[in-house]
Protein backbone atom coordinates (compact mmCIF):
# COMPACT_ATOMS: atom_id res chain seq x y z
CA UNK A 1 0.00 0.00 0.00
CA UNK A 2 2.82 2.36 0.93
CA UNK A 3 4.63 1.63 -2.35
CA UNK A 4 1.41 2.12 -4.28
CA UNK A 5 0.78 5.48 -2.59
CA UNK A 6 4.31 6.67 -3.38
CA UNK A 7 4.05 5.54 -6.99
CA UNK A 8 0.68 7.24 -7.33
CA UNK A 9 2.06 10.47 -5.87
CA UNK A 10 5.05 10.34 -8.22
CA UNK A 11 2.78 9.74 -11.21
CA UNK A 12 0.59 12.70 -10.26
CA UNK A 13 3.66 14.91 -9.81
CA UNK A 14 4.98 13.92 -13.25
CA UNK A 15 1.55 14.50 -14.76
CA UNK A 16 1.34 17.94 -13.16
CA UNK A 17 4.81 18.74 -14.48
CA UNK A 18 3.81 17.72 -18.00
CA UNK A 19 0.63 19.80 -17.75
CA UNK A 20 2.51 22.95 -16.80
CA UNK A 21 4.83 22.80 -19.79
CA UNK A 22 2.33 24.14 -22.35
CA UNK A 23 1.57 27.07 -20.04
CA UNK A 24 5.25 27.88 -19.67
CA UNK A 25 5.67 27.67 -23.43
CA UNK A 26 2.78 30.08 -23.91
CA UNK A 27 4.37 32.50 -21.48
CA UNK A 28 7.63 32.24 -23.41
CA UNK A 29 5.91 32.80 -26.76
CA UNK A 30 4.00 35.79 -25.42
CA UNK A 31 7.30 37.02 -24.00
CA UNK A 32 9.03 36.91 -27.38
CA UNK A 33 6.15 38.89 -28.86
CA UNK A 34 6.33 41.46 -26.04
CA UNK A 35 10.10 41.81 -26.55
CA UNK A 36 9.49 42.28 -30.26
CA UNK A 37 6.93 44.99 -29.52
CA UNK A 38 9.45 46.83 -27.34
CA UNK A 39 12.09 46.87 -30.08
CA UNK A 40 9.57 47.80 -32.77
CA UNK A 41 8.38 50.83 -30.78
CA UNK A 42 11.96 51.94 -30.01
CA UNK A 43 12.77 51.60 -33.70
CA UNK A 44 9.73 53.66 -34.73
CA UNK A 45 10.66 56.52 -32.37
CA UNK A 46 14.28 56.47 -33.60
CA UNK A 47 13.20 56.39 -37.25
CA UNK A 48 10.91 59.39 -36.73
CA UNK A 49 13.86 61.21 -35.13
CA UNK A 50 16.10 60.34 -38.09
CA UNK A 51 13.47 61.69 -40.48
CA UNK A 52 12.93 64.83 -38.39
CA UNK A 53 9.29 63.96 -37.76
CA UNK A 54 9.21 64.42 -34.00
CA UNK A 55 10.47 61.10 -32.73
CA UNK A 56 13.36 60.69 -30.33
CA UNK A 57 16.38 58.51 -29.68
CA UNK A 58 15.30 56.65 -26.59
CA UNK A 59 15.77 53.40 -24.78
CA UNK A 60 13.17 51.26 -23.09
CA UNK A 61 12.44 53.76 -20.30
CA UNK A 62 11.72 56.64 -22.66
CA UNK A 63 9.69 54.40 -24.93
CA UNK A 64 7.52 53.16 -22.06
CA UNK A 65 6.91 56.71 -20.86
CA UNK A 66 5.99 57.76 -24.40
CA UNK A 67 3.54 54.86 -24.70
CA UNK A 68 1.97 55.79 -21.35
CA UNK A 69 0.94 59.17 -22.77
CA UNK A 70 -0.90 57.66 -25.74
CA UNK A 71 -4.53 56.48 -25.94
CA UNK A 72 -4.81 53.00 -24.40
CA UNK A 73 -1.15 53.36 -23.42
CA UNK A 74 -1.63 51.90 -19.96
CA UNK A 75 -3.31 48.80 -21.39
CA UNK A 76 -0.36 48.29 -23.75
CA UNK A 77 2.06 48.75 -20.84
CA UNK A 78 0.29 46.02 -18.89
CA UNK A 79 0.46 43.70 -21.88
CA UNK A 80 4.16 44.44 -22.38
CA UNK A 81 4.94 44.03 -18.67
CA UNK A 82 3.11 40.71 -18.31
CA UNK A 83 4.54 39.45 -21.59
CA UNK A 84 8.09 40.27 -20.52
CA UNK A 85 7.56 38.36 -17.28
CA UNK A 86 6.92 35.33 -19.49
CA UNK A 87 10.10 36.13 -21.42
CA UNK A 88 12.10 36.30 -18.18
CA UNK A 89 10.74 32.93 -17.02
CA UNK A 90 11.76 31.33 -20.33
CA UNK A 91 15.24 32.90 -20.21
CA UNK A 92 15.73 31.50 -16.69
CA UNK A 93 14.67 28.06 -17.94
CA UNK A 94 17.26 28.35 -20.74
CA UNK A 95 19.93 29.16 -18.14
CA UNK A 96 19.07 26.34 -15.73
CA UNK A 97 17.69 23.49 -17.87
CA UNK A 98 19.57 24.31 -21.09
CA UNK A 99 16.80 23.15 -23.48
CA UNK A 100 18.86 24.42 -26.42
CA UNK A 101 21.77 22.14 -25.42
CA UNK A 102 24.34 24.94 -25.33
CA UNK A 103 26.46 22.81 -23.00
CA UNK A 104 29.02 23.70 -20.36
CA UNK A 105 32.03 24.60 -22.50
CA UNK A 106 33.23 28.21 -22.65
CA UNK A 107 30.96 29.14 -25.56
CA UNK A 108 27.92 27.48 -23.99
CA UNK A 109 28.47 29.07 -20.59
CA UNK A 110 28.93 32.52 -22.17
CA UNK A 111 25.68 32.10 -24.10
CA UNK A 112 23.81 31.00 -20.98
CA UNK A 113 25.33 33.87 -19.02
CA UNK A 114 23.93 36.14 -21.73
CA UNK A 115 20.50 34.63 -21.10
CA UNK A 116 20.91 35.37 -17.38
CA UNK A 117 21.83 39.01 -18.05
CA UNK A 118 18.89 39.22 -20.46
CA UNK A 119 16.53 37.90 -17.76
CA UNK A 120 17.73 40.56 -15.31
CA UNK A 121 17.42 43.38 -17.86
CA UNK A 122 13.97 42.40 -19.07
CA UNK A 123 12.82 41.75 -15.53
CA UNK A 124 13.66 45.38 -14.77
CA UNK A 125 11.86 46.53 -17.93
CA UNK A 126 8.77 44.49 -17.00
CA UNK A 127 8.79 46.02 -13.50
CA UNK A 128 9.13 49.49 -14.98
CA UNK A 129 6.30 48.96 -17.47
CA UNK A 130 3.93 47.74 -14.76
CA UNK A 131 5.04 50.51 -12.38
CA UNK A 132 4.26 53.19 -14.96
CA UNK A 133 0.92 51.52 -15.75
CA UNK A 134 0.07 51.61 -12.03
CA UNK A 135 1.18 55.26 -11.76
CA UNK A 136 3.84 54.10 -9.32
CA UNK A 137 6.62 56.14 -10.87
CA UNK A 138 9.36 55.36 -13.34
CA UNK A 139 11.13 52.75 -11.23
CA UNK A 140 14.53 54.45 -11.52
CA UNK A 141 16.61 51.70 -13.09
CA UNK A 142 18.76 53.54 -15.62
CA UNK A 143 22.16 52.23 -16.65
CA UNK A 144 23.87 55.17 -14.93
CA UNK A 145 22.04 54.53 -11.64
CA UNK A 146 22.81 50.81 -11.71
CA UNK A 147 26.46 51.46 -12.57
CA UNK A 148 26.81 54.02 -9.77
CA UNK A 149 25.46 51.50 -7.24
CA UNK A 150 27.77 48.77 -8.51
CA UNK A 151 30.81 51.05 -8.41
CA UNK A 152 30.14 51.66 -4.72
CA UNK A 153 30.45 47.91 -4.02
CA UNK A 154 33.64 45.88 -3.52
CA UNK A 155 34.93 44.69 -6.89
CA UNK A 156 32.24 46.85 -8.51
CA UNK A 157 34.46 47.85 -11.44
CA UNK A 158 35.29 44.21 -12.13
CA UNK A 159 31.61 43.27 -12.07
CA UNK A 160 30.70 46.07 -14.48
CA UNK A 161 33.58 45.08 -16.76
CA UNK A 162 32.43 41.45 -16.73
CA UNK A 163 28.87 42.52 -17.58
CA UNK A 164 30.27 44.57 -20.46
CA UNK A 165 32.23 41.59 -21.80
CA UNK A 166 29.14 39.35 -21.59
CA UNK A 167 27.00 41.92 -23.41
CA UNK A 168 29.63 42.33 -26.15
CA UNK A 169 29.94 38.55 -26.48
CA UNK A 170 26.18 38.18 -26.77
CA UNK A 171 26.07 41.03 -29.28
CA UNK A 172 28.70 39.33 -31.45
CA UNK A 173 26.74 36.08 -31.16
CA UNK A 174 23.64 37.91 -32.41
CA UNK A 175 25.64 39.34 -35.32
CA UNK A 176 26.89 35.90 -36.31
CA UNK A 177 23.50 34.29 -35.81
CA UNK A 178 21.88 36.93 -38.00
CA UNK A 179 24.50 36.87 -40.76
CA UNK A 180 24.57 33.06 -40.96
CA UNK A 181 20.76 32.80 -40.67
CA UNK A 182 21.20 30.00 -38.13
CA UNK A 183 18.17 31.33 -36.26
CA UNK A 184 15.97 29.75 -38.95
CA UNK A 185 16.90 26.32 -37.53
CA UNK A 186 14.84 27.17 -34.44
CA UNK A 187 11.61 27.70 -36.38
CA UNK A 188 8.95 25.10 -37.06
CA UNK A 189 9.28 25.83 -40.77
CA UNK A 190 6.93 23.01 -41.76
CA UNK A 191 4.09 25.06 -40.24
CA UNK A 192 5.05 28.25 -42.08
CA UNK A 193 4.07 29.17 -45.61
CA UNK A 194 6.62 30.55 -48.10
CA UNK A 195 5.68 34.17 -47.38
CA UNK A 196 6.09 33.71 -43.61
CA UNK A 197 9.45 32.00 -44.06
CA UNK A 198 10.66 34.86 -46.26
CA UNK A 199 9.59 37.52 -43.76
CA UNK A 200 11.14 35.57 -40.88
CA UNK A 201 14.44 35.18 -42.75
CA UNK A 202 14.71 38.83 -43.86
CA UNK A 203 13.51 40.43 -40.62
CA UNK A 204 15.57 38.05 -38.49
CA UNK A 205 18.78 38.57 -40.45
CA UNK A 206 18.69 42.37 -40.58
CA UNK A 207 17.13 42.68 -37.14
CA UNK A 208 19.67 40.49 -35.37
CA UNK A 209 22.58 42.24 -37.08
CA UNK A 210 21.23 45.63 -35.96
CA UNK A 211 20.53 44.45 -32.42
CA UNK A 212 23.91 42.74 -32.19
CA UNK A 213 25.69 45.96 -33.18
CA UNK A 214 23.70 47.98 -30.63
CA UNK A 215 24.41 45.42 -27.88
CA UNK A 216 28.13 45.49 -28.67
CA UNK A 217 28.10 49.28 -28.31
CA UNK A 218 26.28 49.05 -24.97
CA UNK A 219 28.84 46.51 -23.73
CA UNK A 220 31.63 48.85 -24.81
CA UNK A 221 30.06 51.65 -22.74
CA UNK A 222 29.99 49.37 -19.69
CA UNK A 223 33.67 48.53 -20.14
CA UNK A 224 34.45 52.26 -20.36
CA UNK A 225 32.59 52.68 -17.07
CA UNK A 226 34.69 49.93 -15.49
CA UNK A 227 37.95 51.48 -16.72
CA UNK A 228 37.15 55.08 -15.78
CA UNK A 229 34.99 54.37 -12.70
CA UNK A 230 32.61 56.96 -14.13
CA UNK A 231 28.93 55.89 -14.19
CA UNK A 232 28.16 58.58 -16.77
CA UNK A 233 29.90 56.38 -19.35
CA UNK A 234 27.17 53.73 -19.01
CA UNK A 235 24.59 54.00 -21.75
CA UNK A 236 21.73 51.91 -23.02
CA UNK A 237 20.01 51.73 -26.39
CA UNK A 238 19.40 55.48 -26.33
CA UNK A 239 23.11 56.14 -25.83
CA UNK A 240 24.06 53.78 -28.66
CA UNK A 241 21.60 55.48 -31.02
CA UNK A 242 22.81 58.94 -29.98
CA UNK A 243 26.40 57.84 -30.62
CA UNK A 244 25.45 56.77 -34.14
CA UNK A 245 23.62 60.04 -34.76
CA UNK A 246 26.71 62.04 -33.75
CA UNK A 247 28.88 60.47 -36.46
CA UNK A 248 29.26 61.68 -40.06
CA UNK A 249 26.09 60.74 -41.96
CA UNK A 250 24.62 60.16 -38.51
CA UNK A 251 21.00 60.55 -39.56
CA UNK A 252 21.47 57.85 -42.17
CA UNK A 253 23.15 55.56 -39.64
CA UNK A 254 20.38 56.26 -37.15
CA UNK A 255 17.73 55.52 -39.76
CA UNK A 256 19.38 52.22 -40.70
CA UNK A 257 19.70 51.19 -37.04
CA UNK A 258 16.09 52.20 -36.39
CA UNK A 259 14.85 50.16 -39.35
CA UNK A 260 16.90 47.21 -38.11
CA UNK A 261 15.36 47.42 -34.64
CA UNK A 262 11.88 47.56 -36.17
CA UNK A 263 12.70 44.45 -38.21
CA UNK A 264 13.92 42.74 -35.04
CA UNK A 265 10.54 43.57 -33.52
CA UNK A 266 8.76 41.88 -36.43
CA UNK A 267 11.10 38.89 -36.06
CA UNK A 268 10.22 38.72 -32.34
CA UNK A 269 6.52 38.40 -33.09
CA UNK A 270 7.17 35.65 -35.67
CA UNK A 271 9.53 33.97 -33.22
CA UNK A 272 6.81 33.89 -30.60
CA UNK A 273 4.49 32.18 -33.03
CA UNK A 274 6.77 29.65 -34.70
CA UNK A 275 9.94 29.01 -32.67
CA UNK A 276 10.42 25.43 -31.52
CA UNK A 277 10.42 25.41 -27.71
CA UNK A 278 11.28 22.24 -25.80
CA UNK A 279 12.56 21.25 -22.38
CA UNK A 280 15.24 18.97 -23.72
CA UNK A 281 13.75 15.92 -22.09
CA UNK A 282 10.61 15.84 -24.21
Predicted regions and their residues:
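Hydrophobic alpha-helical membrane-insertion segments
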Residues: 35-43, 116-129, 206-223
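Cytosolic juxtamembrane helix and N-cap/initiation of the first transmembrane helix
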Residues: 17-37, 196, 203
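Hydrophobic, ordered structural segments
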Residues: 17-23, 27, 41, 45-48, ...
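Juxtamembrane inter-helical linkers in multi-pass membrane proteins
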Residues: 183-201
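N-terminal juxtamembrane cytosolic/stromal segments of multi-pass membrane proteins
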Residues: 1-28, 63
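Short, membrane-exposed interhelical loops at transmembrane-helix boundaries
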Residues: 58-67, 146-150, 196, 231-252
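C-terminal functional regions that serve as terminal interaction/effector modules
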Residues: 2-15, 208-282
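Alpha-helical transmembrane segments of multi-pass membrane proteins
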Residues: 36-56
